[in-house]
UniProtKB/Swiss-Prot annotation:
Gene Ontology annotations of biological process type: canonical glycolysis; glycolytic process; glycolytic process through fructose-6-phosphate; positive regulation of cell migration; protein homotetramerization
Organism the protein comes from: Mus musculus (Mouse)
Identification of the protein by name: Fructose-bisphosphate aldolase A
NCBIfam families reported in the protein's UniProt record: FrucBisAld_I (NF033379)
InterPro entries from the UniProt entry: Aldolase_I_AS, Aldolase_TIM, FBA_I
Lineage of the species this protein comes from: Eukaryota, Metazoa, Chordata, Craniata, Vertebrata
EC number(s) per entry: 4.1.2.13
UniProt cross-link Glycyl lysine isopeptide (Lys-Gly) (interchain with G-Cter in SUMO2), position: 42
Catalysed reactions, semicolon-separated: beta-D-fructose 1,6-bisphosphate = D-glyceraldehyde 3-phosphate + dihydroxyacetone phosphate
Origin: domain of life: Eukaryota
Record-stated family: Belongs to the class I fructose-bisphosphate aldolase family.
SUPFAM superfamilies: Aldolase
Quaternary structure, from the entry: Homotetramer. Interacts with SNX9 and WAS. Interacts with FBP2; the interaction blocks FBP2 inhibition by physiological concentrations of AMP and reduces inhibition by Ca(2+).
N6-(2-hydroxyisobutyryl)lysine, modified sites: 99, 147
Keyword annotations of the record: Acetylation, Cytoplasm, Glycolysis, Hydroxylation, Isopeptide bond, Lyase, Phosphoprotein, Schiff base, Ubl conjugation
Length: 364
């Protein structure tokens, strides 16, 4: 029989489990502010703002220093490497700012998607080289969890068995390396919403992908209580002509998770996948109201679905700081309610609340 070497000690396991529970405590979710320099460039460009280090710092500071109303809503913040080492105007490093508000600091550790030879345009994710050393350093610098994104696409012949297996294995290797360094891995196998497939097809593919991911995590001796899953919601493809209700999306999503995700997993933090801000909140709420047994915390790890209205309200102008923070706070409060199944759509939406945030073939 296989034995895990080196095994995690009971102390290491407790630390990992405690961190995971803090991130997804009731009413809390994750702010994904880990856009790479290239991705944040597109966001800044959309508001006519130059992609300088100072503008990136100022914008992240705007989010991280929103007033204490967000404290009960945000359990963790995922940062990009650069942001982890930036400081607020008052001289405090951003990790300190996040911790002072009760949040856990996270770091994106993958190095982006690369083509997977032998497939029809499918990808794997790079960044395992030197990952252990980077994790050790990030832990010293205040990060307690990490994120790694793999991408799968639904097509007539995709995802292929090869792409599913390769991505599941790379996620498992990453997760194992994180845990050896005291960092909770967020496992993100994103199935893109591109395509004209219906809800059933997305559910089927999601089940196959998640089953492969948890088999790989078991093979690599990953301690599930010290992990979080960041999956897509089960939705029809963006080009699907058939409409499905929020309840149908919720039922398909929870069913897929119940069939594949062990109850030992601490929490599921959904990605928003280009849904509008309002849609992402409504679907999360429906998922939490779904009348099936759900043994994990079901919450959010949203990027654009927490930031779109705030970004628009800021518009690159310092004097719009407060207005932008109000928009961010509004979404944080909405999603905090949604992850408890208590959200009622207000209709008084933000600057971009109902705009689709879909970007085809989305690469961070």
């Amino acid at each position: 029989m296989p034995h895990p070497y080196p095994a995690l000690t009971p102390e290491q396991k407790k630390e990992l489990s405690d961190i995971a529970h803090r991130i997804v405590a009731p009413g809390k979710g994750i702010l994904a502010a880990d856009e790479s320099t290239g991705s944040i460039a597109k966001r800044l460009q959309s508001i006519g703002t130059e992609n300088t280090e100072e503008n990136r710092r100022f914008y992240r500071q705007l989010l991280l220093t929103a007033d204490d109303r967000v404290n009960p809503c945000i359990g963790g913040v995922i940062l990009f490497h650069e942001t982890l080492y930036q400081k607020a105007d008052d001289g405090r490093p951003f990790p300190q700012v996040i911790k002072s508000k009760g949040g856990v600091v996270g770091i994106k550790v993958d190095k982006g998607v690369v083509p997977l030879a032998g497939t029809n345009g499918e990808t794997t994710t790079q960044g395992l080289d030197g990952l252990s050393e980077r994790c050790a350093q990030y832990k010293k610098d205040g990060a307690d969890f990490a994120k790694w994104r793999c991408v799968l696409k639904i097509g007539e012949h995709t995802p292929s068995a090869l792409a599913i297996m390769e991505n599941a294995n790379v996620l498992a290797r990453y997760a194992s390396i994180c845990q050896q360094n005291g960092i909770v891995p967020i496992v993100e196998p994103e199935i893109l919403p591109d395509g004209d497939h219906d809800l059933k097809r997305c559910q089927y593919v999601t089940e196959k992908v998640l089953a492969a991911v948890y088999k790989a995590l078991s093979d690599h001796h990953v301690y599930l209580e010290g992990t979080l899953l960041k999956p897509n919601m089960v939705t029809p493809g963006h080009a699907c002509t058939q409409k499905f209700s929020n309840e149908e999306i919720a039922m398909a999503t929870v069913t897929a998770l119940r069939r594949t995700v062990p109850p030992a997993v601490t929490g599921v933090t959904f990605l928003s996948g280009g849904q509008s801000e309002e849609e992402a909140s409504i679907n999360l709420n429906a998922i939490n109201k779904c009348p099936l047994l759900k043994p994990w915390a079901l919450t959010f790890s949203y990027g654009r679905a927490l930031q779109a209205s705030a970004l628009k309200a800021w518009g690159g102008k310092k004097e719009n700081l407060k207005a932008a923070q109000e928009e961010y706070i509004k979404r944080a409060l909405a999603n905090s309610l949604a992850c408890q199944g208590k959200y009622t759509p207000s209709g008084q939406s933000g600057a971009a609340a109902s705009e689709s945030l879909f970007i085809s073939n989305h690469a961070y």
